[in-house]
């Protein structure tokens, strides 16, 4: 004898009228590390830029849902993402519209044409020397369950081992 159980999440209220309630978007972020033996964790207060676009639509403000287009969220102590300060929560569409999420970190409020600029000349601002990017959350319906977003490093990690040799002395390498 086989028996199966299934459960659905009730996101409606109002009995027979089935008035849809507003559902806030929740994210549970993780980071894919450069090194498989190393676990990267978010720090409380880190910022993330969020885009909520109609499923399979072109990446544009016109296709954004509820004007969620480069909006800021912050990492909380529990590792979840939350809208900053007194800003209203990001809400799913109240109909059955599917959405795609694109996220990046750290958040930059003044992106020009949605291009992230990387300038490694000033290493003091190390947060802006490496960006994280996530586009794995696609085809999502509204839910109270946090959306799992996996961030990856956008830029490759390079390690240079420079040694002195012909034409380059050990003294020359000290100034590098």
Outline where the language-model segments fall:
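Short, low-hydrophobicity acidic/polar segments
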Residues: 10-175
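C-terminal motif of bacterial Sec signal peptides marking the signal peptidase cleavage site
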Residues: 4-7
């Amino acid at each position: 004898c086989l028996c199966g159980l299934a459960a659905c999440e009730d996101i409606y209220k109002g009995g027979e009228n089935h008035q849809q309630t507003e559902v806030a978007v929740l994210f549970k972020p993780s980071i894919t590390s450069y090194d498989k033996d190393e676990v990267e964790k978010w720090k409380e207060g880190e910022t993330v830029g969020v885009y909520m676009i109609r499923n399979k639509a072109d990446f544009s403000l016109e296709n954004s849902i509820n004007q969620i287009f480069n909006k800021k969220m912050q990492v909380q102590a529990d590792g979840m993402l939350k809208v900053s300060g007194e800003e209203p929560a990001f809400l799913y569409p109240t109909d059955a519209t599917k959405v795609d999420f694109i996220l990046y970190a750290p958040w930059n409020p003044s992106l020009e044409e949605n291009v992230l600029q990387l300038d490694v000349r000033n290493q003091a601002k190390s947060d802006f020397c490496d960006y994280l990017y996530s586009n794995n959350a696609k085809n999502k319906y509204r839910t109270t369950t946090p959306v799992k977003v996996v961030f990856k490093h956008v830029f490759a990690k390079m390690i240079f081992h420079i040694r002195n040799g012909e034409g380059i002395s050990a003294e020359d390498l000290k100034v590098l």
